[in-house]
Amino acid sequence: MTPPTTGLPAENTTDDNDHLVQSDDPEHPANLIPSLCAKFWTLGWVTGTGGGASIRDDDLVYLAPSGVQKELMKPSDIYVLSLAAQAQSLSRRQRVYLRSPPVYKPSQCTPLFLAAFTKRNAGCCIHTHSHWAVLVTLILEQQGSKEFRINNIEQIKGFGKGFQKSGNLGYHDTLVIPVIENTAHEEDLTEFLEEAMDKYPDTYAVLVRRHGVYVWGDNVHKAKTQCESLDYLFQLAVEMKQLGLPWITDIEPTIPTRKD
């Protein structure tokens, strides 16, 4: 095997570790990422090469590249790095790639994806530029708020209770998603994302003001379904705001009386 390639994020390098992204299994990360991104493109989540996704398979991390049209992505476009080698890197901005495509640049989302893997042991992290997510951050900006909070909505059940906790949130629970401010360069968001993770240990997502959202999960299924649920709630919240409806309500639980 060719030794790992070490370089700065902007560096393009090539090696012969193409076997890492070659598989007939549709569930292989190198096949899943293009498939997922093509679906996300139809939803408007990764328009104009924005957004991306990353999947961790044990120590191997598979990443969508920068600058690629997400609906046209191929397995051969995928970067692969070693999580352990990255943790041992002397520089947080230095990457240890096992496999690099010859054309594209590594995604600036990479350190944010790595934060989800190292701090939450996530199996997948998704970054979208959903306009519903952006609109929610603008509404919160007007309110001077750094949290998205909503309760008493059925779709809240689509979220886990938190890191290393079993079960999902309930209908009457309050979903809380922190908001961090955007930066001129994506990589510079990393420390603020990590701070939000520390402050909100149970969150599965972080909103980025005027930018989008990062969502992660224990595996691809959970990350995808939580991202879908969150986008549903963002759209609902924007439309509720237009109708003058509150996101937080005090509703008495309905208790069934039948005993059979």
UniProtKB/Swiss-Prot annotation:
It catalyses: 5-(methylsulfanyl)-D-ribulose 1-phosphate = 5-methylsulfanyl-2,3-dioxopentyl phosphate + H2O. One of its GO terms (biological process) is L-methionine salvage from methylthioadenosine. Pfam families: Aldolase_II. Its EC number is 4.2.1.109. Substrate binds at residue 109. It is an enzyme of class 4 (lyase). Its cofactor is Zn(2+). The keyword Membrane does not apply. SUPFAM superfamilies: AraD/HMP-PK domain-like (SSF53639). Residues 1-26 are annotated as: Disordered. It is found in: Cytoplasm. This is Methylthioribulose-1-phosphate dehydratase. The lineage of its organism: Eukaryota, Fungi, Dikarya, Ascomycota, Pezizomycotina. The gene is MDE1.
